[in-house]
């Protein structure tokens, strides 16, 4: 796992949490939760790739892992759309920078998950 990606996730989550304090947006809270969930999933998938023997354990423990993978891509697409919408509607430069970084991170994570999943398939 790339340490820059980890710090990027942490930075964006902290920034979004600060925005949450300023506005009582339930949508933003949901986005933060989705980001945290996505980070955990990406980390677990990356660890499984590092230990290729875990592929069989992963498949036997959860026969629906491809379905889960598909669901995660749906979540990523949803988050990308939400972030794009927030970018269009916000006027705060702090929020714009945060959402631009979040969008870039989502695209990077989507690519990482695709790479991991192809290695597992």
Curated annotation (Swiss-Prot):
- The residues that cross the membrane are none
Q: Which GO terms describe its cellular component?
A: host cell nucleus; virion component
**Alphabetized UniProt keyword annotations:** Host nucleus, Host-virus interaction, Transport, Virion
Query: What is one GO biological process annotated to this record?
Result: exit of virus from host cell nucleus through nuclear pore
Q: Could you tell me the superkingdom of the organism this chain comes from?
A: Viruses
Q: Which family does it belong to?
A: Belongs to the influenza viruses NEP family.
Instruction: Return the protein name.
Output: Nuclear export protein
Which organism was this protein described from?
Influenza A virus (strain A/Gull/Maryland/704/1977 H13N6)
Its gene name is NS
């Amino acid at each position: 796992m790339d340490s820059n990606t980890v710090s990027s996730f942490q930075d964006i989550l902290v920034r979004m949490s600060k925005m949450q304090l300023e506005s009582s947006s339930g949508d933003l809270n949901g986005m933060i939760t989705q980001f945290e969930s996505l980070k955990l999933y990406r980390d677990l998938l990356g660890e499984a790739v590092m230990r290729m023997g875990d592929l069989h354990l992963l498949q036997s423990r959860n026969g629906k892992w491809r379905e889960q993978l598909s669901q995660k891509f749906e979540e990523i697409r949803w988050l990308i759309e939400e972030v794009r919408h927030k970018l269009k509607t916000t006027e705060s430069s702090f929020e714009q920078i945060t959402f631009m970084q979040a969008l870039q991170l989502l695209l990077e994570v989507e690519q990482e998950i695709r790479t991991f999943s192809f290695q597992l398939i």
